[in-house]
């Protein structure tokens, strides 16, 4: 797995994760699995097609140009849940084409973890990923085989199925299969990162809310209800009044930021005008 260290790419990921959460809102498990598969598929397409990859990640072009290109090429290939996520991704500013691919893969993994979370199985997935990382890391030959980027992806996926099929959660199996298909470094390290990603999702139960004016009780209840629907768990609100926002709300849940403030919209407009 690849960690996004550039600030622009982290901001792009945060914006696209918000779109992902909206896409999964009210979705059945099979729909979320399909969404994840399609995001993995787009990442694979960009990995193969260098010209397309560069065009969709070119921050010097107008975001609308990148959006039109993505819609023209992918609208017939993607479902109604995946397409808006991909569009948001290509409209965003990534530091490199590699980060765009890594971001799409991260979003696909997050979708699968959301599925496990809503089924009440996120704890189990986290534990399985952690234990598999330790098991594979302790077997030198297996680690070498699964981490080798020159080894057949299909062959490695078959090995994974033989090892864990029927023994772990379906989400766990899907995550491991995808990880070994395109390993970036040691698979055991990738599994540890996935376990950490799972743990972060479990910890996202507090929303830090900044508003230009105090929220009424009714507004607080409505916001808490909306966030609970998005995150599939009760969300406690930590409220702060910040007149500099000008209006609207700025909500942070874990690493995810929902910026509906006037100041945020103006800043976004300035970035678009500068592109």
Curated annotation (Swiss-Prot):
Keyword Ubl conjugation annotated: no
Family listed: Belongs to the ATPase delta chain family.
Name recorded for this polypeptide: ATP synthase subunit delta
Cystines in this chain: none
NCBIfam families attached to this UniProt entry: ATP_synt_delta (TIGR01145), PRK13430.1 (NF009967)
Topology relative to the membrane: Peripheral membrane protein
Record's function text: F(1)F(0) ATP synthase produces ATP from ADP in the presence of a proton or sodium gradient. F-type ATPases consist of two structural domains, F(1) containing the extramembraneous catalytic core and F(0) containing the membrane proton channel, linked together by a central stalk and a peripheral stalk. During catalysis, ATP synthesis in the catalytic domain of F(1) is coupled via a rotary mechanism of the central stalk subunits to proton translocation. This protein is part of the stalk that links CF(0) to CF(1). It either transmits conformational changes from CF(0) to CF(1) or is implicated in proton conduction.
UniProt keyword Ion transport present: yes
Origin superkingdom: Bacteria
Species the sequence originates in: Saccharopolyspora erythraea (strain ATCC 11635 / DSM 40517 / JCM 4748 / NBRC 13426 / NCIMB 8594 / NRRL 2338)
Keywords, comma-separated and alphabetical: ATP synthesis, Cell membrane, CF(1), Hydrogen ion transport, Ion transport, Membrane, Transport
Subcellular location(s) per record: Cell membrane
Main location: membrane
């Amino acid at each position: 797995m690849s960690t996004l260290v550039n600030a622009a790419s982290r901001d792009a990921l945060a914006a696209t994760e918000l779109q992902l959460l909206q896409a999964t809102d009210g979705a059945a498990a099979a729909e979320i699995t399909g969404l994840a598969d399609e995001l993995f598929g787009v990442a694979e397409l960009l990995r193969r097609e260098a010209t397309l990859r560069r065009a969709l990640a070119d921050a010097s072009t107008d975001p609308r140009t990148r959006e039109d290109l993505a819609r023209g090429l992918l609208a017939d290939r993607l479902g109604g849940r995946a397409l808006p996520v991909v569009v948001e991704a290509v409209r965003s500013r990534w530091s490199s084409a590699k980060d765009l691919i890594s971001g799409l893969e991260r979003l696909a993994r997050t979708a699968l973890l959301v599925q496990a979370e809503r089924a009440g199985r996120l704890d189990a997935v986290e534990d399985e990923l952690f234990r598999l990382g330790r098991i594979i890391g302790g077997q030198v030959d297996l680690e070498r085989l699964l981490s080798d980027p020159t080894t057949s992806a299909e062959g490695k996926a078959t090995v994974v199925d033989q090892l864990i099929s029927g023994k772990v959660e379906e989400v766990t199996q899907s995550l491991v299969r995808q990880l070994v298909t395109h390993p970036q470094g040691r698979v055991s390290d990738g599994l540890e990162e996935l376990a950490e990603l799972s743990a972060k999702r479990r910890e996202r139960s507090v929303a830090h809310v900044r508003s230009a004016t105090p929220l009424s009780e009714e507004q607080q209840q409505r916001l808490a209800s909306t966030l609970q629907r998005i995150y599939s768990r009760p969300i406690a609100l930590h409220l702060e009044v910040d007149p500099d926002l000008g209006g609207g709300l700025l909500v942070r849940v874990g690493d995810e930021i929902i910026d509906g403030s006037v100041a945020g919209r103006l800043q976004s407009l300035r970035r678009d005008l500068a592109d």
